[in-house]
Structure formats: structure tokens, C-alpha cells
Amino acid sequence: MKRIFLLIVTNLAVLLVASIVMSILGVNTSTMGGLLVFAAIFGFGGAFISLAISKWMAKKTMGCEVITTPRDSTERWLLDTVARQAQQAGIKMPEVAIYQSPEMNAFATGPSKDNSLVAVSTGLLYGMSQDEIEGVLAHEVSHVANGDMVTLTLIQGVVNTFVIFAARVVAGIINNFVSSNDEEGEGLGMFAYMAVVFVLDMLFGILASIIVAYFSRIREYRADEGAARLAGKNKMIAALERLRQGPESSAMPAQMSAFGINGKRSMAELMMSHPPLEKRIAALQSR
């Protein structure tokens, strides 16, 4: 209940701040053009702010320890492997980090190909063979080389803009309908209008999540293919087979999970950021 209350308060606060900012900028959101500008600024703005702080956020939320000076042979091997793969992929050496987690997972993040982070869990680092880890690292390096962080940010910006725009257009239609059937012609009123916008934001947000998840799954297949080129198909398949034997990924926030090696499983594949491991293995075997 507390989480729902905080979500509602946060959404209302965002709407209030957005309205104040757009008023200062002189954008008239009562027109379609003004509303579209409003939606684009906040839709893309939020997505790109998330991208800009993605490395910092990952380090803070996951407790990542960036390897500057290797403490043992395992960390030295980890750095050398990422450096070799980054050179093969034609990108600048990412920062390499380790975070404490018993689950086997890894992720890549960062605002650009030349400013990225590859992080692995302790569960993966000490629970997989070196060949399997090499496949995982190649997958994450491929995410960076393919520019997946920027690509999905652009997609997120587009769907954010759609959600903000569509929710307010539909809320306006509902408000006009209520106003035309109201003797006083007052419509919904401010609080009722904001409540309608909130509900529509949630509904359209679910649709937007399906679209983003679809593109995320496509990028996962591409990262698997890239990993097969960098580390070899057999190592990538071995890594996925090992992940299939393990428990479901659960500890990673959604923003990092989208670029992880092992995503959360879902009853509805439409909502999954990663294809099922079985399908990924089959796709590699058919290459």
C-alpha cells in the first residue's frame, strides 16, 4: 500500500513540476503542438537523464567495486579478457567491476561506447568456468559495441513521449465529454483530471513496456551473435546452458537487467526483456 501511495504522489509531483516548467517556457499544452512538445521534452529528457547517470546509478545501486588494480589472478584475468574483447570489438576499454550477489549474472551500462561499464556478480565469477565467463563477457561487450544503451534510450524516449501525449489527449477528450454533459460545464476538475491522467499513464505505460521489451529481446539475440564472434559459439552456448541450470535472476534493477546476461522470467513472454534461454541457445545452434 505504501509503494502505491508513493507512486501516486511521485506521479502527481512530476505532473505538477512538468506543468510549472512548461508554463515558464511558455508552451501552451492546451494545443496539440504544445502538448507534443511537452511530451517530447519530458519523454526524451527522462530517458537521456537515466542514460547519462547510468554508470553512477549502477555503481551505487549494485554496490559495484571497479577494478583499478587487480588483487588476484582472477581479477587480472577478468581485466585482460575484457580488454582483449573490447579491442576486437573496436571500442574503448570499459570499466570493469564486481558486485556481491550469489546469483550468476552480469550487465553492461554507460552513456556511450567509449564510456561504459561491464560488471559481473561474485556468483558468476566464482560459479562458472573461464570459458563460460568469457562467453558472458563477450555478450556484455557486444551490448556496448552495438550501442544498445543509446538505442534503447531512444526507443524509451519515443514510447515515453507516446504515453505522456496519448494519456493527456484521452484525458482531454474525457474532460470535454463530462463538461458537455455537465450543466455547469466545469468538466472533471483538476484533481479528477490528474487522477484520470495517472490511470491512463499506467495503462499506456504497460503497452509501452511491451514495445520496449520487444526491442530489448531483439538486441539480446544480436548480443549473443556478437559474443559468438568474439569468444566463439561454443563458449556462448555453454554460458547460456549454465545459466539455464541456475535459479531465476531477481536481484538486479530493471535498468541494469535490460543489459544483463540473464533476465527475469515471466509468464508472458511479451513482458520479458530477454528471450527464454532455450530460444537463445537454439538461435546460436542454428547459426
Curated annotation (Swiss-Prot):
NCBIfam families: PRK05457.1. Binds 1 zinc ion per subunit. The gene is htpX. This is Protease HtpX. It comes from Shewanella oneidensis (strain ATCC 700550 / JCM 31522 / CIP 106686 / LMG 19005 / NCIMB 14063 / MR-1). CDD domains: M48B_HtpX_like. The chain crosses the membrane at residues 4-24, 33-53, 154-174, 195-215. The keyword Hydrolase applies. GO terms for biological process: proteolysis. Its cofactor is Zn(2+).
